[in-house]
């Protein structure tokens, strides 16, 4: 039962709850986010073990929804759903899980980044078709969101290192208050490409890409296809470095030939 799971993992859940309370006082502390992620991964593993052991339990789908389901576990959750009998999957909760899985799969690797027209801070129109020729790092964020502002430190490092030469860096804001967005760009000296989605969260492009949280980053290859999604922090920076190194190696081979 869910109650038994919560009691058995009471200490871990308490640590997670206490860690989340520290958010606004430690929003600039990268070690804080690493610690929180480790705790959340631990509860995910426990939930997976419980669901795998008792797929017919009515509690399993609740544990999946509450503790296991996220952008990185959709395939795992889908496989676990397949071994659950229909009577253990109430329609209302199953619909929510299926919708989440569908949204994440819409942004599967290899798909072309959908076309849309955005606005920069000067009010000029910018087409996503310009995200070509070199890899592009696209990050959805909002000026009012502490986690977004924290992630900007990592995006800044990527931009400072590659300067839109080998990697293009683009932010897409979901701000409602356009003036606050412009002020944040100036205050935080966000020098790279800054765009805003005029319809915020309601935009069809936002929904079609399955954006359900911010900050959220997608990496496009030079043809505009999705190469990687959902990375942040050190994982994002390491991936970009490896990607550039791989591209440089390929270019070097071409030159020799």
Q: Predicted regions span which residues?
A:
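N-terminal targeting signals for export/organelle localization
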Residues: 38-109, 257
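Short active-site neighborhood of thiol/selenol oxidoreductases, capturing the structured segment around
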Residues: 127-149, 155, 168
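Structural microenvironment flanking redox-active thiols in thiol-disulfide oxidoreductases
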Residues: 149-188, 200-206
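Thiol/disulfide oxidoreductase modules built on the thioredoxin-like
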Residues: 190, 199-242
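Loop/turn elements at helix/coil->beta-strand transitions in domains of secreted/extracellular proteins
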Residues: 132-136, 164-167, 190-192, 222
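A non-transmembrane, solvent-exposed segment enriched in polar/low-complexity residues
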Residues: 1-45
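N-terminal "domain-start" segment that seeds a small globular fold
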Residues: 95-128, 192, 239-241, 245-249
């Amino acid at each position: 039962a869910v109650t038994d799971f919560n009691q058995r993992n009471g200490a871990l859940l308490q640590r997670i709850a206490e860690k989340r309370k520290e958010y606004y006082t430690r929003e600039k502390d990268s070690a804080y986010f690493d610690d929180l992620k480790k705790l959340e991964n631990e509860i995910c593993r426990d939930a997976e073990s419980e669901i795998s052991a008792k797929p017919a339990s009515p509690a399993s789908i609740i544990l999946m929804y509450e503790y296991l389901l996220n952008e990185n576990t959709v395939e795992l959750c889908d496989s676990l759903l397949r071994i659950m009998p229909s009577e253990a999957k109430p329609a209302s909760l199953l619909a929510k899980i299926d919708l989440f899985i569908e949204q994440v799969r819409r942004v599967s690797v290899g798909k072309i980044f959908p076309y849309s027209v955005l606005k920069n801070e000067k009010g000029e129109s910018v087409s996503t078709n310009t995200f070509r020729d070199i890899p592009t790092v696209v990050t959805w964020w909002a000026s009012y969101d502490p986690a977004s502002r924290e992630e900007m430190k990592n995006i800044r490092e990527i931009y400072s290192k590659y300067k839109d030469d080998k990697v293009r860096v683009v932010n897409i804001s979901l701000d409602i208050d356009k003036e606050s967005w412009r002020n944040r760009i100036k205050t935080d000296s966000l020098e790279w490409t800054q765009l805003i989605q005029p319809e915020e969260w309601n935009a069809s492009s936002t929904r079609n890409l399955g954006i359900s949280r911010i900050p959220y980053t997608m990496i496009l290859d030079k043809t505009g296809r999705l190469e990687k999604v959902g990375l942040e922090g050190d994982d994002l920076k390491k991936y970009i470095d490896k990607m550039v190194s791989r591209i440089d190696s390929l270019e070097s081979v071409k030159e020799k030939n």
